[in-house]
Amino acid sequence: MMVAWWSLFLYGLQVAAPALAATPADWRSQSIYFLLTDRFARTDGSTTATCNTADQKYCGGTWQGIIDKLDYIQGMGFTAIWITPVTAQLPQTTAYGDAYHGYWQQDIYSLNENYGTADDLKALSSALHERGMYLMVDVVANHMGYDGAGSSVDYSVFKPFSSQDYFHPFCFIQNYEDQTQVEDCWLGDNTVSLPDLDTTKDVVKNEWYDWVGSLVSNYSIDGLRIDTVKHVQKDFWPGYNKAAGVYCIGEVLDGDPAYTCPYQNVMDGVLNYPIYYPLLNAFKSTSGSMDDLYNMINTVKSDCPDSTLLGTFVENHDNPRFASYTNDIALAKNVAAFIILNDGIPIIYAGQEQHYAGGNDPANREATWLSGYPTDSELYKLIASRNAIRNYAISKDTGFVTYKNWPIYKDDTTIPMRKGTDGSQIVTILSNKGASGDSYTLSLSGAGYTAGQQLTEVIGCTTVTVGSDGNVPVPMAGGLPRVLYPTEKLAGSKICYG
């Protein structure tokens, strides 16, 4: 059996995993696989168990199921997983279905028994750490969840916030341009309301700070993804981040860097929604704008406090799958390459590697097990090889993760980017020509390589030689991305030559 070079490389990297840590600096070098616990893997290992996303019911995914499929995740080169919230949820089947996703909590001191036991969650953490991998857990501090109208909430069901005194007075957000409304009024609607905790009160702050520190300690958690960050006043977050004692990345669902970037002053990182929108628009069709993406890369790295601590993504459980816009596999490969080789921490959403195409919630919350977990699909292999070269570059260049990605050129269909210290840089060339794109040679200047230097294109494992003028002749075809790395630096890596 022929074994792909990237699997050999990743295996070698895994067994040499460093000691675990959980600081922002340590998270820079991670690569995250995000999954909905209920939708990734079942304890019984079934790949046929029914999961109709339209029903919005529990489908049976568990923490033990994740443990059993860590080879599948690690085989793509991921070094961390992010799982959905673990707290006990509202028990009813609402008109919007079950709280299978984890964002309608009622008891923060109990676990969601649908996913397993406390021992199962601890076992997941241990299983990851034995592999040198990190555990990131999703948390919600903004709200609880209630099956019913906001005007008739029975606050006694919430633990420990069991009276109305802990909450903002009921009002739904009507105007998202009004930050006071965004923070003080409620999400949800009169079918499922999301009672909004008054996080300005010391009793609420202190409860959350104590809770989050205990959660991290009890389950040996390495990082937190924080939901609905913009709906809580900013001065709440530094204390929460400090109490957690690990890297925290917040969801600020807004594409304006002037709005989103300042939240990085109150927590370690945020999801890179400013990049998400131009990234999606650049590659969801063959007529997308490279200008907007080029400009936003530069804006984010100049305006955000630290673009190397942001989370880069194009899919999640709140936004439509990339393949719901286009089934062009070449475009999907380009967008995945960008995610992994841009600044910050790459985040791939479970099912993206199988080209899942669900649209808006709930269609984008498909069961990964229904794919059968193939490891030979085109995107699985591409993601694995991109993670492999990123992981290798990090191991060889201490400055790789803090070097800010530099888009060195653009035209209507192409954007090359450079990341890494001189002599060890990765140059990624992205195209939105699509799978029917023509074959041509791109003469690339500004890559920073030296005349006569040999480079390996690590997707196709071919080589090119830098011209006497310093330009790199890059063969382009079929709209596929290209990733260049100095050939001499690959010695002993198993990458392309294993």
From Swiss-Prot:
It catalyses: Endohydrolysis of (1->4)-alpha-D-glucosidic linkages in polysaccharides containing three or more (1->4)-alpha-linked D-glucose units. GO terms for biological process: carbohydrate catabolic process. It is an enzyme of class 3 (hydrolase). Ca(2+) 2 binds at D227, E251. Glycans are attached at N218. Belongs to the glycosyl hydrolase 13 family. This is Alpha-amylase A. It comes from Aspergillus awamori.
